[in-house]
């Protein structure tokens, strides 16, 4: 495995979609939405937020990613992940730092994210780097019923 110094943190580009999606598909418990996570929607997101999303690259391969954007008032992180074999080496922290700096430069003062309550590793990571969970109710309203969420690793559990 590449040394941490050999891991590059780079802005996510539209051309990274296939490699980023392939990474998402390896993350057990990852929630992939049929429409929001399609090539078309991720490209639209990157075009709206051209400097804020990030990938981590080792030996020419994408091994981490974060979709990061802002509505002009608050920043948001989505789909934060690092390939299992590269975890616990500071890569996630470096990627989050990159995103936070980009948001700071845009004048954004607050950033949020959603971590599933059963995502023990993810929740431990966020606490470790100083994030606080909020006691808020999260509501969503589905505008398009085709935008179903599939959780990676759960495909065969119903059979």
Which residues fall in each region the model found?
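Active-site acidic-Proline motif in GNAT/NAT acetyltransferases
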Residues: 70, 83-89, 117-118
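Conserved acetyl-CoA-binding loop-helix of GNAT-fold acetyltransferases
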Residues: 82, 88-101, 128
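Conserved GNAT acetyl-CoA-binding A-motif
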Residues: 103-115
């Amino acid at each position: 495995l590449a040394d941490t110094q050999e891991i590059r943190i780079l802005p996510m580009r539209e051309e990274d979609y296939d490699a980023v999606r392939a990474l998402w598909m390896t993350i057990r418990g990852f929630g992939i939405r049929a429409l929001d996570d399609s090539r078309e929607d991720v490209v639209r997101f990157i075009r709206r937020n051209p400097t804020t999303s990030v990938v981590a690259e080792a030996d020419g391969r994408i091994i981490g990613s974060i979709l990061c954007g802002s509505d002009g008032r608050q920043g948001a992180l989505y789909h934060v992940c690092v390939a299992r074999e590269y975890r616990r080496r500071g890569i996630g922290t470096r990627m989050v730092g990159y995103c936070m700096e980009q948001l700071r430069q845009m004048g954004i003062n607050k950033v949020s994210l959603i971590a599933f309550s059963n995502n023990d590793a993810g929740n431990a990571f966020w606490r470790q780097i100083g994030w606080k969970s909020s006691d808020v109710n999260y509501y969503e309203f589905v505008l398009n019923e085709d935008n179903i969420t599939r959780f990676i690793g759960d495909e065969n559990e119903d059979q």
